[in-house]
């Protein structure tokens, strides 16, 4: 639909001139026709699949580009932001000067000038009191489709007099030739100005930069108001009991929160305020590598008309080879949240969480499939944000790569990690919430813990049977492990049982414990961090 109150003249205020036409808040049918326009070339062009969803390629960037992320350092951000060049912890918040910002802004506005543009007005945040009104400006139809899927779609009434709090200008086709002189990482850039409230994108076509860009902004604004901002999925049971699932990419956030027995609040980004837990988004962004109808039926059936596939292999007959990771292992699909049947309606929010689940995919095979955390262990493991990946090599040698990502989302944090931990703990204490560490990764057999066992573990957490189970303590990590759980193979609950000998586990566990201790060093420069050391592994 075209709304008369947004004209090319209005865009001059942003520095975008001589716009040929504005396609404002296009319908899904309009986007479908635009994406499949045979006149399109390169990465603008979509391909129709037999599932009804359009598939696109995002070019050389098949994931985010954290090394190309910058934030303007000015009076707004100087003393509040977690900068990459201050303190012990590493992060991606590289400072940008006002001068370089103006240059980058000029590149993007020049790129968008004289074009036919898609403008999508959305909300970020399901709670009307704290949501951001976000305007996306792009020349690429599928990028407009992506944000229409991923953000909250305003009603026609809400669009009347829509005033954006934040503007995202996507100039994917332009790059910065002066990057070397400006001391930047490359010709590509994802830059934020929290005073002007603008995000600029140049050189990368990856849709996730728009999604995670707004997450970084919410991560700045909300905790300063005492509201938890979380990289997690969330769902609610029949009795109104809310659970949140923290975890890095590939640990099972989307899969485990999409549960036929519970209604989905959202799969990736949430806030927690005085009313309860609310989704930031209006869609889901699921990994599709090795997707099968049998293992993940809800996600598979969500891939239909209006869903948008990224970087998958589409065969000549229009069928999708979900097993093919030749372009990237990070193949994805975005779809509006209502493509999942069992969701919270009409607004993606619910009450206070009583179960907080930290998901880790431990490729070292050391951590138990589930353990119950004390209050201090909750903060320790939240700040550690551990997972580990298996990296394949030509000869099949697979050495695990550890990842410690503060708050299970360090790439998106704009404040110091301890600020998120403090707000989360306050919210948990007020709600009487309990935290658990769930390992969805590997054990001593070299096999990944089955989705079936993990789902049974999650059920035991959610129905309270884990809280009533007898527990024993795992050495080194001092984790409380249940002796048995309904529907779970008792043998695997103690990770030592999956090794040929307890000594083998001990050796690997000692190596992993050292990594935890080394990583946590960066928090010991504050009294609060120092106090948490005892909640971690002890050698």
From Swiss-Prot:
| Residues annotated for ATP binding in this entry | 212, 231, 247-255, 296, 332, 448-449, 454
Question: What reaction is this protein's catalytic activity?
Answer: oxaloacetate + ATP = phosphoenolpyruvate + ADP + CO2
Quaternary form?
Answer: Monomer.
Which cellular compartments is it found in? Cytoplasm
What this chain does, per the entry, is described as: Involved in the gluconeogenesis. Catalyzes the conversion of oxaloacetate (OAA) to phosphoenolpyruvate (PEP) through direct phosphoryl transfer between the nucleoside triphosphate and OAA.
What species does this protein belong to? Salmonella choleraesuis (strain SC-B67)
Concerning Pfam families, the annotation shows: PEPCK_ATP
**Catalytic activity, EC:** 4.1.1.49
Q: What is the lineage of its organism?
A: Bacteria, Pseudomonadati, Pseudomonadota, Gammaproteobacteria, Enterobacterales
Q: Which InterPro entries match?
A: PEP_carboxykinase_ATP, PEP_carboxykinase_C, PEP_carboxykinase_N, PEPCK_ATP_CS
Q: What is the name attached to this protein's record?
A: Phosphoenolpyruvate carboxykinase (ATP)
**Family, per the entry?**
Belongs to the phosphoenolpyruvate carboxykinase (ATP) family.
Key word Transcription regulation present in the record?
no
A GO BP term, please?
gluconeogenesis
Q: Which GO terms describe its cellular component?
A: cytosol
Q: Which CDD domains match?
A: PEPCK_ATP (cd00484)
Q: In which pathway does this enzyme or protein participate?
A: Carbohydrate biosynthesis; gluconeogenesis
Needed cofactors, names only, are: Mn(2+)
The GO terms describing molecular function are: ATP binding; metal ion binding; phosphoenolpyruvate carboxykinase (ATP) activity
**Top-level taxon of the source organism:** Bacteria
Q: Which keywords describe this protein according to UniProt?
A: ATP-binding, Cytoplasm, Decarboxylase, Gluconeogenesis, Lyase, Manganese, Metal-binding, Nucleotide-binding
Instruction: Give the chief site where it resides.
Output: cytoplasm
What does the entry's cofactor note say about binding and number? Answer: Binds 1 Mn(2+) ion per subunit.
Ligand binding (Mn(2+)): 212, 231, 268
**Which annotated residues bind substrate?**
64, 206, 212, 332
């Amino acid at each position: 639909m075209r709304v008369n109150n947004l004209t090319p003249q209005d865009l001059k205020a942003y520095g975008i001139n001589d716009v040929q036409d504005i396609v404002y808040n296009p319908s899904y049918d309009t986007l479908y026709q635009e994406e499949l326009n045979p006149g399109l070339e390169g990465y603008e062009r979509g391909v129709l699949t037999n599932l009804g969803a359009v598939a696109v390629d995002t070019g050389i960037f098949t994931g985010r580009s954290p090394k190309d992320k910058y934030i303007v350092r000015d009076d707004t951000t100087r003393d509040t932001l977690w900068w990459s060049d201050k303190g012990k912890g590493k992060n991606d918040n590289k400072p940008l000067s006002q001068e370089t910002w103006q240059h980058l802004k000029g590149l993007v506005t020049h790129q968008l000038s004289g074009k036919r543009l898609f403008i999508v007005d959305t909300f970020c945040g399901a709670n009307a009191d704290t949501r951001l009104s976000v305007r996306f400006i792009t020349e690429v139809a599928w990028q407009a489709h992506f944000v229409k899927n991923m953000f909250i779609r305003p009603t026609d009434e809400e669009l009347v007099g829509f005033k954006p709090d934040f503007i995202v200008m996507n100039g994917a086709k332009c790059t910065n030739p002066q990057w070397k002189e400006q001391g930047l990482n490359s010709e590509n850039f994802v830059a934020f100005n929290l005073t002007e409230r603008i995000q600029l994108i140049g050189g990368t076509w990856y849709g996730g930069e728009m999604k995670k860009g707004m997450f970084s902004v919410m991560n700045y604004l909300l905790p300063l108001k005492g509201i938890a901002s979380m990289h997690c999925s969330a769902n609610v049971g029949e009795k109104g009991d809310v659970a949140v699932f923290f975890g890095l990419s590939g640990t099972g956030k989307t899969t485990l929160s999409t549960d036929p027995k519970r209604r989905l609040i959202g799969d990736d980004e949430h806030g927690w305020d005085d009313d309860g837990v609310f989704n930031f988004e209006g869609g889901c962004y699921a990994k599709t590598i090795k997707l099968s109808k049998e293992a993940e039926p809800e996600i598979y059936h969500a891939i239909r008309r209006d869903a948008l596939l990224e970087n998958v292999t589409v065969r000549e007959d229009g069928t999708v080879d979900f097993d093919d990771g030749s372009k990237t292992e990070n193949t994805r699909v975005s779809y509006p949240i209502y493509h999942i049947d069992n969701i919270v309606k009409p607004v993606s929010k619910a009450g206070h969480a009583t179960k907080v689940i930290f998901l880790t995919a431990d490729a070292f095979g050391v951590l138990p499939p589930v353990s119950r955390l004390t209050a201090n262990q909750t903060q320790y493991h939240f700040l550690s944000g551990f997972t580990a990946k298996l990296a394949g090599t030509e000869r099949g040698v697979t050495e695990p790569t550890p990842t410690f990502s503060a708050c299970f989302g360090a790439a998106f944090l704009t404040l110091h990690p301890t600020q998120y931990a403090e707000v989360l703990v306050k919210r948990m204490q007020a709600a009487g919430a309990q935290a658990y560490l769930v390992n969805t990764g590997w054990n001593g057999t070299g096999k990944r813990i089955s989705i079936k066992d993990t789902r049974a573990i999650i059920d035991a957490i959610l129905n309270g049977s884990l809280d009533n189970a007898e527990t024993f303590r795992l050495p080194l990590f001092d984790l409380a492990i249940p002796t048995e759980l309904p529907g779970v193979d008792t043998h695997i609950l103690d990770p030592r049982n999956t090794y040929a000998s307890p000594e083998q586990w001990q050796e690997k566990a000692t190596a992993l414990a050292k990594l935890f201790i080394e990583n946590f060093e960066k928090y010991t420069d504050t009294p609060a961090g120092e106090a948490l050391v005892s909640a971690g592994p002890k050698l």
